[in-house]
Amino acid sequence: TYKPHKPQHIAENVLNRKFQADYNAMEVLLTDVTEFKYGVHSKAYLSAILDYGENKIVAYKLSRHNNNALVRDTVTQIKDTIIPMKTLFHSDRGFQYTSHGFKNFVEEHKIIQSMSRVGRCIDNGPMENFWGIIKEEMYRLTTYNTFEELEKDIEAYIEFYNTKRVTLKMGLRIPA
């Protein structure tokens, strides 16, 4: 369910859909949170970071709660691999990414922050594409009764995506 929020911080759309360019590893990171259902009425939230240059998920976390801690825990996984003044971090305008806490993380690690324009999910197209892929290839035809079942399959799917899944972006090659 969408809950309107008042953004504490907004960044420009620096990436500006430059998806055709060649990027090095850790140069352009895309992120978002998506929802999965399990059990009768339960929800889980997956926060992930896609390294666009390598076309790999470099960090992710599944949680029962969609909150600032979920995103903080995800970005903390990559803090030591960020290239100061070079890494561009693109997200939508979700409350986690417009918070003072996230802005402080970005400033502390000298990250260039970029945000999609309001109502323009295509501005974060490759990340949205990943959500479509994981939901189609892993989730759609499976019923998950527990959080742990879902978590196990997400972990296995991301490993598959990063190491074995052939993609057009990578020239129909299996990732290295």
PLM feature spans:
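RNase H-like polynucleotidyl transferase catalytic core
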Residues: 1, 89-93, 107-126, 142-147
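Basic, flexible linker segments flanking DNA-binding modules
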Residues: 1-23, 120, 174-176
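C-terminal domain-tail junction helix/linker
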Residues: 3, 107-111, 133-176
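An active-site-proximal beta-strand-loop segment
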Residues: 17-58, 64-65
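Active-site beta-loop-alpha junctions of metal-dependent nucleic acid enzymes
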Residues: 42, 60-82
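Short small-residue beta-strand/loop micro-motif enriched in glycine and branched aliphatics
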Residues: 54-60, 113-116, 140-141
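Acidic/histidine-rich, metal-coordinating catalytic segments
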Residues: 83-98, 117, 121, 171-175
